UniProtKB/Swiss-Prot annotation:
Its EC number is 2.7.7.6. One of its GO terms (biological process) is DNA-templated transcription. It comes from Paracidovorax citrulli (strain AAC00-1). It catalyses: RNA(n) + a ribonucleoside 5'-triphosphate = RNA(n+1) + diphosphate. It is an enzyme of class 2 (transferase). One of its GO terms (cellular component) is DNA-directed RNA polymerase complex. This is DNA-directed RNA polymerase subunit beta. GO terms for molecular function: DNA binding; DNA-directed RNA polymerase activity; ribonucleoside binding. It comes from the Bacteria. PANTHER family: DNA-DIRECTED RNA POLYMERASE I SUBUNIT 2. The keyword Transcription applies. The gene is rpoB. Keywords: DNA-directed RNA polymerase, Nucleotidyltransferase, Transcription, Transferase. DNA-dependent RNA polymerase catalyzes the transcription of DNA into RNA using the four ribonucleoside triphosphates as substrates. Belongs to the RNA polymerase beta chain family.
Length: 1374
């Protein structure tokens, strides 16, 4: 296998050793591609208006316009739309609680036609008014694929819904007790009425519109213009008879007789009996009849009786209809036909097997006579009770399926429809045609006749994904449709009054529709931001729920189950546990959407058994046509499939097939799983249920203080970290010019710098920012000044990343052994050292908000002047009444002082006097300050003050603005300094050695410019030098212009920033001032916290043990975590054991590298050892591209352990793990550590007694995570608190500061103990006995302990409820 020769900046620092057996032909695509592409297509912001395609916003406008007035003389046309630059950037929107959006302005024309000179054919334009009209604000997507709505980051989840088109299915025999299959068909449009066709148990075919009352299908067929004759002609073939005086002659058709039982003797032309009565007719018989030249067979009279006439039979003489189409033949009718001289008779051919008389039977129960009557019947079904006038009837029928405004199949629907009914073209009209309806009924009848197969609803060829763009477009359309109605009403006025387009269009409906969708839709979700993996997974989620989708309650087992078409499209592992299982899925790693919204997955093309590098993306329907080999199929050196039989999939079934039949091959073994599942090493050794938990729990891992890369990974870590957007990557290559904790400045390479633009990139890092889940988002630079970067290199780590790789946990030394029952039932025993070293300490940031409102009694005030508070309680507030940054606060501490006016009370004369003397105002206001909640404490890290326009800013608010501006000015100055330095460097290179025509300091013409001269001249005077060469002069001029422009743009940027900061803030109605205080809380690991590995092995910390008591190895190394070995076998997640073994090897090799560095080994020696580590097994790495310094720098990074990649389904084998263990622990180290021969177990010693445990213990390193279920957030206690209004019982839950429910079983427990008094107080004074509660409180205050239990309020509620039923119930004392 070819080694990888190019390494990025971070890879050079630490290469992950991969055990993948073959390189992936296709790189993992950008993981947020689906979201970003969909929204880009919706906005088409960067496209010139003329070049925009008819999708997204453009399609919405095209559908709504032109709007024509009722009289037809005024028209409003849409020309183009533009998107304005958003007023605030993402960060500002988050801080101010705004929506990151852009205003849409549409250019529309109001055309008024001249009534006098216009005719119905040609209209003469009287005047045209063109204007740009505001059409609401459209939220913009951030770089990370999310939206900022009202200051919070949200994600629009894609929806998996049933594709428009036609579907055929049956009820699986569930409807009728006999188990008979009832077939049905359904035409589903994108917009418009659903049309269903269904058989009932009596084999009569019905249709229904929008699930209303069912009607015989022949009514619909008549309504589309067919008469009974043409209906029968469309569905049946005819048997031709010639009537004789007695009996008849039947035309001989061999295929129709085969398999039937002869009801009479069948003779040939000569009269010879070929088939005797009651014998079955076989192919031999029909052949004999054909050979004898028989064209007609004589049939007796009773053979005709019961047959159905195929067409109307008219008496030639009188013109009277003797027999109607679909009439059954009887003796009387036959007599009538003979007397009318009818000789030739056509009846429909039916049989019991494959030619049922369903349509004929349906026609018989249909009472409508003609097309209009049929349409009236449909009108009555749709609009019961309304009088069916002719116009209304025709209009309704037309509007149901034939009007593009009300019915839209969509491109997808038409494509699916045509494919289903066997048409070749994939395009066509977006409304139904009569032929379409007829074709569907024909296929349904064929299905009932046993021809063809029903559709599989859960096949991914029948389900498509609606992305953000499409969902937003639908909302925009709804808004425009409302506008269209309003405009249509008012358009007529434009003839008389001088109205402009903006007078007619009110954008409110659009804004309302979008606001409702982005703010409250089921698919618009609060982004899960616990860690980068959670973010990326949330954006790749595909939900079957939501408007137009399924509901939890109605979704059956089949919809939730894994389907064969999920392969490579939707992850079979990652889905939530609980009621949503299988309804919310995650997109597979390589999956993408095609133009129709169906999920595609890539395959390598195989030609004559040779695997090519050509990649084709196939949708689920296309995949069914091919034979596809697995990604791990054996190949020879030339890339040919080896072996006689290859494991492959055909039509969803896995089989062994010959290599010649294979047409495609999987791209990568990881292609079937999602991002989260692909980060689980040794996934192939885990049971699916546990793998599901592992994938789900890695999304709940809390970012810790110092992230640590997983020792055993899968190779996807780097991709996931970069694509999630938490790390900072270089936009362009260059050299690092400046680094500090808050920003990185890169001087861009000359070849990547755009002419006339500043050749400097400045990356401002995020510091201590609160995420949606209150975790800490924090970026740290990982580059040094002078480092050379390429485009795309990671230059700063974010939360939960380490050197550009996702790092959601810590590598811990794990021992699998029981320890005094402390790891019973998945409990986890942890060493004190882990806590002391802050390995799992995380920072959580809480946002506390206080608002000063305008109340009826006067405005609330944020102030330091709070009644009844001591100076000690106020000493951390500044003069504006706001706490200072850096203060450490405890529960109950005041953060922001606020007073609210309270209603005037009548004062006694003494109080009036006192207030007159002392000006005491305290009694007018009550203290409503913001305080720290019970159970939380921390450090104030930031304060923000927002003031409404027109309200005086306090000193604190002004100071915050000044600080912000100062910081911004510093930033700009730094940028300018670097830009200038860069410009002067370029000028120096440009002028050095050139001839000048003159310049400052009396530079003579023809003098060569050198560095000494340039150093002697002020840099700003370099522009006065006049080079002899014109080209150099123009370059110098362009640098000068670029510099001046940059200075000017910086001044403008500063002005704009100042304007933004000093203008009033947009606050909710009635709010005058808002203060946000951010608290940072340090959470250390403690008993009760939930932890987990990546294999679904979760548990709760039971005890933190002093390090000296932990089991330790022979060389004194104590274990970090002790897990129960019983957690492995029954759970069948063996991946964790393999991870522990490989992690143990990685750590051992790291320690050997550390020993070599301590012994000051030479680079060559180190290179030799690293060659052995990286290139003895698995994928080869080309270490020769690294310089000696880079090799030593990498070695220093590997001392904590060599990171491994064991790709999903292509991971390290047992032999490879054993080789690595041998390399890590040569015999001398093995002995010293007390390892067994396999090096996977060690003899441990009891930390408390020093005795050796009897049996060896499995020990090694596992990447262990701390999950977001922290005991601090769950711990809760209450004495008194809020009560429910109706029942007067304490509320429930921590958020409401509620109590614990004393339920039925707890009551039984007290009854069992006979604790009657305890039970009484539980059911009364501690619950809802209102008088009793107050009395207990009084007696406690007095120091007494008497309890008087009264009537519980819930009893009163019960009495009231009984009264509401009309039963008078009263309590009487006995």
């Amino acid at each position: 296998m070819a080694p990888t020769s190019t390494y990025s900046y971070t890879e050079r620092k630490r290469i992950r050793k991969s055990f993948g057996s073959r390189d992936s032909v296709l790189k993992v695509p950008y993981l947020l591609q689906m979201q970003k592409d969909a929204y880009t297509a919706f906005l088409q912001a960067d496209m010139a208006p003329q070049k925009r395609t008819n999708e997204g916003l453009q399609a919405a406008f095209n559908a709504a316009f032109p709007i024509v007035s009722h009289n037809g003389f005024v028209e409003m046309k849409f020309v183009e739309y533009n998107l304005a630059k958003p007023a605030f950037d993402v960060r500002e929107c988050q801080t101010r609680g705004l929506t990151f959006a852009s205003a849409v302005r549409a250019k529309v024309q109001l055309i008024i036609y001249d009534r006098e000179s216009s005719t119905s054919q040609s209209k003469v334009v009287k005047e045209v008014k063109e204007q740009e009209v505001y059409m609401g604000e459209v939220p913009l997507m951030t770089d990370k694929g999310s939206f900022i709505i009202n200051g919070t980051e949200r994600v629009i989840v894609s929806q998996l819904h049933r594709s428009p088109g036609v579907f055929f299915e049956h009820d699986k025999g569930k409807t009728h007790s006999s188990g008979k299959l009832l077939f049905s068909a359904r035409i589903i449009p994108y917009r418009g009425s659903w049309l269903d066709f269904e058989f009932d148990p009596k084999d009569i075919l019905y249709f229904r519109v929008d699930r209303r009352r069912k009607m015989p299908v022949t009514i619909l067929l008549k309504a589309i213009g067919l008469n009974p004759e043409s209906i029968l002609a469309n569905f049946f073939v005819n048997d031709n008879f010639r009537l004789m005086d007695s009996g008849a002659q039947m035309e001989f058709v061999a295929d129709r007789l085969k398999g039937e039982v002869a009801r009479f003797d069948i003779t040939d032309k000569s009269g010879k009996v070929v088939v005797a009565k009651d014998k079955r007719i076989t192919a031999r018989h029909t052949r004999e009849l054909e050979q004898s030249g028989t064209t007609h067979i004589s049939v007796p009279e009773d053979f005709l009786i019961g047959r159905v006439v195929a067409r109307n039979i008219v008496d030639g003489d009188t013109g009277e209809i003797v027999a109607k189409a679909n009439e059954e033949l009887t003796e009387a009718l036959l007599k009538k036909l003979r007397s009318a001289g009818v000789q030739d008779l056509q009846v429909i051919y039916t049989n019991e097997l494959d030619q049922g008389a369903y349509i004929s039977q349906t026609l018989r129960i249909d009472e409508t006579v003609d097309e209009f009557a049929a349409r009236v019947a449909i009108y009555r079904m749709m609009r019961p009770g309304e009088p069916p006038t002719e116009d209304a009837v025709q209009a309704l029928f037309q509007r149901l399926f034939y009007n593009p405004d009300t019915y839209d199949l969509s491109r997808v629907g038409r494509m699916k429809f045509n494919a289903k009914i066997g048409r070749d073209e994939s395009t066509g009209p977006m409304v139904l045609s009569n032929d379409d309806i007829l074709a569907v009924v024909k296929i349904l009848v064929d299905l009932r006749n046993g021809k063809g197969e029903v559709d599989d609803i859960d096949h991914l060829g029948n389900r498509r994904v609606r992305c953000v763009g499409e969902l937003a477009e639908n909302q925009y359309r709804t808004g425009l449709a409302r506008i269209e109605k309003a405009v249509k009403e008012r358009l007529g006025q434009a003839e008389q009054e001088p109205l402009m387009p903006h007078d007619l269009i009110n954008s409110k409906p659009i804004s309302a529709a979008l606001k409702e969708f982005f703010g409250a839709s089921q698919l618009s979700q609060f982004m899960d931001q616990t860690n980068p993996l959670a973010e990326i997974t949330h954006k790749r989620r595909v939900s079957a729920l939501g408007p137009g989708g399924l509901t939890r309650e109605r979704a059956g087992f089949e919809v939730r189950d894994v389907h064969v078409t999920h392969y490579g499209r939707v992850c079979p592992i990652e889905t939530p546990e609980g009621p949503n299982i299988g309804l919310i899925n995650s997109l597979a790693l390589y999956a993408r959407l095609n133009e129709y919204g169906f999920i595609e997955t890539p395959y390598r093309r195989v030609v004559d058994g040779k695997v090519t590098d050509q990649i084709d993306y196939l949708s689920a329907i296309e995949e069914g046509k091919y034979v596809i080999a697995q990604a791990n199929a054996a190949l020879d050196a030339e890339g040919r499939l080896t072996g006689d039989l290859v494991s492959a999939r055909e039509k969803g079934e896995s089989t062994l097939l010959s290599a010649e039949r294979v047409q495609y091959m999987d791209v990568s073994p990881a292609q079937i799983v999602s991002v989260a599942a692909s980060l689980v090493p040794f996934l192939e050794h885990d049971d699916a249920n546990r793998a599901l938990m592992g994938a789900n729990m890695s999304r709940q891992a809390v970012p810790v203080l110092r992230p640590e890369k997983p020792m055993v990974g899968t190779g996807i870590e780097r991709v996931a970290a970069v694509d999630s957007g938490t790390v900072v990557t270089a936009n362009r290559g260059g050299i690092v010019d400046y680094v500090d904790a808050t920003r990185i400045v890169v001087r861009v390479n000359d070849d990547e710098a755009v002419a006339g633009e500043v050749g400097v990139d400045i990356y401002n890092l995020i510091k201590y920012q609160r995420s949606n889940q209150n975790t800490n988002i924090h970026q740290r630079p990982i580059v040094k000044k002078g480092d050379v970067l390429a485009k795309g290199d990671v230059i700063a780590d974010g939360a939960s990343t380490d050197l550009g790789e996702i790092a959601i946990g810590q590598n811990m030394l794990i021992a699998f052994m029981p320890w005094n029952g402390y790891n019973f039932e998945d409990s986890i025993l942890i060493s004190e050292r882990v806590v002391a070293e802050d390995r799992y300490t995380s920072i959580h940031i809480e946002e506390l908000v206080v608002m000063a409102r305008d109340t009826k009694l006067g405005a609330e005030e944020i102030t330091r002047d709070i009644p009844n508070l001591s100076e000690q309680q106020l000493n951390r507030l500044d003069e504006s009444g706001i706490i200072y940054v850096g203060a450490e606060v405890q529960p109950g501490d005041t953060l922001v002082g606020k007073v609210t006016p309270k209603g005037e009370t009548t004062l006694t004369p003494e109080e009036k006097l006192l207030r007159a003397i002392f000006g005491e105002k305290a009694s007018d206001v009550k203290d409503t300050s913001l305080r720290v909640d019970q159970g939380s404490s921390g450090t104030v890290i930031d304060v923000q003050v927002f003031t409404r326009e027109g309200i005086q800013r306090d000193k604190r608010a002004q100071q915050i603005i000044d600080d912000e501006l100062k910081r911004f000015r510093l930033d700009l100055n730094d940028q300018l300094r670097i830009v200038e330095a860069d410009a002067f460097d370029r000028i120096e290179k440009l002028l050095n050695g050139r001839v000048a025509n003159g310049g400052p300091q009396k530079l003579a013409k023809g003098t060569k410019i050198d560095k000494a001269y340039l150093a002697s001249v002020e840099k700003f005077h370099w522009f006065d030098i006049r080079p002899a060469e014109d080209e150099v002069a123009t370059q110098l001029e362009s640098i000068k212009n670029a510099l001046e422009q940059t200075r000017h743009s910086f001044d403008l940027a500063f002005e704009e920033k100042r304007k933004k900061l000093t203008q009033g803030d947009e606050l909710p109605a009635g709010v005058l001032k808002m203060v946000k205080v951010y608290l940072a809380v340090k959470r250390r690991l403690q008993p009760g916290d939930k932890m987990a590995g990546r294999h679904g092995n979760k548990g709760v910390v039971s005890k933190i043990v002093p390090v000296e008591d932990m089991p330790y190895m022979a060389d004194g190394t104590p274990a970090d975590i002790v897990l129960n070995p019983l957690g492995v076998p029954s759970r069948m997640n063996i991946g964790q054991v393999l991870e522990v073994h490989l992690g143990w090897a990685g750590k051992g090799i790291g320690q050997r590298i550390g020993d070599m560095l301590r012994d000051q080994a030479k680079a060559a020696e180190m290179r030799k050892f690293l060659e052995e580590v990286y290139n003895s097994r698995g994928r080869k790495e080309d270490l020769s591209v690294l310089s000696d310094d880079e090799v030593m720098a990498m070695a220093a990074n590997l001392t904590n352990g060599v990171p491994y990649a064991t790709p999903v389904f292509d991971g390290a084998s047992e032999a490879e793990i054993k080789d690595m263990l041998k390399l890590a622990y040569p015999d001398d180290i093995k002995e010293r550590k007390g390892l067994t021969e396999s090096r996977t177990q060690a003899y441990l010693y009891d930390g408390r007694t020093g005795e050796r445990f009897e049996r060896p213990t499995t020990i090694g390193y596992m990447h262990y995570l701390k999950l977001h279920h922290l005991v601090d957030d769950k711990m809760h206690a209450r004495s008194t608190g809020p009560y429910s209004l109706v029942t007067q019982q304490p509320l429930g839950g921590k958020a409401q500061f509620g109590g614990q429910r004393f339920g039925e079983m707890e009551v039984w427990a007290l009854e069992a103990y006979g604790a009657s008094y305890v039970l009484q107080e539980m059911l009364t004074v501690k619950s809802d006995d209102v008088q009793g509660r107050t009395k207990v409180y009084e007696s406690i205050v007095k120091g007494e302990h008497a309890i008087e239990a009264g009537m519980p309020e819930s009893f009163n509620v019960l009495v009231k409820e009984i009264r509401s039923l009309g039963l008078d119930i009263e309590l009487e004392r006995s």
